[in-house]
Structures are given as structure tokens and as C-alpha cells.
Amino acid sequence: MTTKLIAGNWKLNGSLAKNAALIDELRRAEMHCVVCVPYPYLAQAQALVAGSLIELGAQDVSEYEQGAYTGEVSAAMLVEFGCRYVIVGHSERRALFGDSDQVVGRKAASALAAGLTPIVCVGETLAERELGEVEAVIRRQLQAVADCVGGEALPTLVVAYEPVWAIGTGRSATPEQVAQTHGFIRAWFSARCDASAVRILYGGSVKPENAAVLFSTDDVDGGLIGGASLVGSDFVAICRAA
């Protein structure tokens, strides 16, 4: 398996001053990581990460290439600002902004067409877990993406398993739960492509205190980090735990 991938999702946070301080801390620590910053800060971040081990990502992308789509940002635009990765299907986009499985699939296809690597987020709610629907939910989410990107593109995806009930709650899934679900995701890909090439990240209340255990769990190839990615010392500690 390839080197573990650690991506920070800044969400709706940051300022010019805070961004500069945070990226400077990551540069000084010589961290190899991805930072997914809000759109307005992409130009600043592109300049700040130049010549470092830090790679740039965005938090969402339009399914459309261009045209009369007010407020949208295309994959080609992200590439011009140095992005290599883009998150698609984050649970907050699905729940708050109505991104359906099909929209997520089209966004992933749009990203791939422009040369971006999509970080495809999948995961279940607490109610779905309690009903025993974890695998059914993730199977549906993955299949919608596969239908849009095609089988040949599957090995190029990054998948982030984010149990919705563990995001921003301080409650992380147990290593056993993570191993079981990541194993299911790996098996799903194995039936369709070379699954060894697919990086499967865990996202959901990853902290310096639990990162090493989570990252040593079977089929965990890194993490998609939310709140802890905004604190330089915490994010550095998480990256080093990988």
C-alpha cells in the first residue's frame, strides 16, 4: 500500500492571517499532507505551499464545466489554482445542501476529467447503523460514483469513510468498527478493480490521542481530518502518527 494520505478539511474556517500561520507551521514541520481550503483562500494557499510537501485541495466542486451556474466553481478552475485533490460527497454537503448520490457521482467525474483526484466521502447516519444498514448505504453511495466515473477510473479514487455520527461530535468509531467498514469498502473495490491502488481514509473525530490506533487499523490508508486540522500542533501530531 502507498504512503498514508492525511488531508485536512478546513470547512468554513480561516482568515488570511490564520492561514499563513497554520501553513507556516506545517512547512516548518516538513509535513507531507493535503490542506483543503475555502475557495477564496486558494490563491493565498497556492503561494504559501509552493516548494513544500503540502498539497492543495478544495472542499467541493461543480458537476458542470462552465456556463450559467451562478455560484459554482468548476474543476478546471481549481486546477488553475494548484489543486490536486477535491472532496466530494461530504456528509455536510449531502445533508445541508442536498447533494444526492448521483450529484456526488457527477462531481467525481467532473473532477477526474480535469485531472483532479476526488476524495469521495461515504458513510452512514447513527439511525442507519442501528438498523444494520451500514453496508447497504455505502454500497449505494459507491455504486452511484462508479456509474458516473466508469470502472477504469475506480482505482484512481480516494475514498473517505466518515460515519456521520462521529463527525464533529468527539465520538470516534472504534477500531473494530473502522476495520469492518473499511474491509467492506476494500472488498467492494476488489470485485471491480485493483483495490490495492485505492486509498481508503477514515474521517470522524480523529485526534492526536487516537490517530495512531486508527491509522494502524487494517485497510486504513490515512485520514480526512476536520477540526484538528485547524490547530497546527494537532495536525502535525496526526500526520506524524501516520
UniProtKB/Swiss-Prot annotation:
EC number, as in UniProt: 5.3.1.1
GO cellular component, one term: cytosol
Positions of substrate binding: N9, W10, K11, G168, S205, G226, G227
Keywords: Cytoplasm, Gluconeogenesis, Glycolysis, Isomerase
Compartment annotation: Cytoplasm
GO molecular function list: triose-phosphate isomerase activity
Catalysed reactions listed for this entry: D-glyceraldehyde 3-phosphate = dihydroxyacetone phosphate
Pathway: Carbohydrate biosynthesis; gluconeogenesis; Carbohydrate degradation; glycolysis; D-glyceraldehyde 3-phosphate from glycerone phosphate: step 1/1
Biological processes per GO annotation: gluconeogenesis; glyceraldehyde-3-phosphate biosynthetic process; glycerol catabolic process; glycolytic process
PROSITE patterns on file: TIM_1, TIM_2
A Pfam family reported for this protein in Swiss-Prot or TrEMBL: TIM
Top-level taxon in the UniProt lineage: Bacteria
Catalytic residue list: H90 (electrophile), E162 (proton acceptor)
HAMAP family: TIM_B
Complex formation: Homodimer.
Family: Belongs to the triosephosphate isomerase family.
Role played: Involved in the gluconeogenesis. Catalyzes stereospecifically the conversion of dihydroxyacetone phosphate (DHAP) to D-glyceraldehyde-3-phosphate (G3P).
Protein name per UniProt: Triosephosphate isomerase
